[in-house]
Amino acid sequence: MMDALNIEKAVIMPLNDPWLMSMEFTVDAVHRNLRDMKQTYPGRFYAFADIDTRNTSAQSVDAIIQAVDGCGLDGIKIHPNNTGVALDDEYNAPIFALAQQRKIPVAIHSYPNTEDDVSVAARIVKTAERFPGLQLIVSHMGAFQWETLLPLECSVDMSAILPDYVRTYGIAKTNEILRSFGVDRLLFASDYPDNRHLPPEELYDSYFAILDQMDFTAEEAERIAYQNAKELLG
């Protein structure tokens, strides 16, 4: 599939739920599975470390260090809505401190439905202020709280949210939203195979059709498609 769509390299994101990504149901097993996928298909995947909030913060930090140093993983994924732990909860503070110190990119799920959601954009702002220089990737662009993220030094990926923006705002306004972040902050992402409205087989064609209607130059499209991610992840 990747070859058919001219995708040279993809990012595998865990879900902060080891029951979904291993048969041993442990975060270490998830990390080994991700390592094995990277090794089986060399040069084709980035993969982010998982967290399991059944473990202590210290245990999660140790597992991330092993995932990055021992398994060759490329970042950390935090999905507050799956863990049930608010992004700015003290549980996550040692994880952010490690990422800040080691300059490890952190991808944060943010598709909040309320102003007090565990992944609300305001919690991302609070975290960024507490840990300056943290390399943040906000997945789903903070959904419909995107304006809160505009002042932050963070990257945003358009996974899941791009078709929802078009459905809500139309192409022109969606184009304006993407432009408001600046091309250098935008990351192409699809959340494949998941989507609230589209079946997996229609996902990429839908994304391509939407982006083809926007005013990005060829050079800007390359930055969004892969250059920004390459600079961030190596």
List each model region and its residues.
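Active-site gating/metal-coordination segments in enzymes
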Residues: 9, 18, 24-107, 113-114, ...
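Catalytic pocket-lining loop regions of alpha/beta-barrel enzymes
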Residues: 74-75, 85-187
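Flexible loop residues that form catalytic
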Residues: 15-18, 81, 141-142, 161, ...
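Conserved, mostly hydrophobic/aromatic
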Residues: 2, 34, 67, 76, ...
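A general structural detector for well-ordered alpha-helical segments in enzyme core domains, enriched
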Residues: 1, 30-37, 63-67, 91-95, ...
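Mid-to-C-terminal alpha-helical segments outside catalytic/metal-binding sites
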Residues: 1-9, 182-185, 199-234
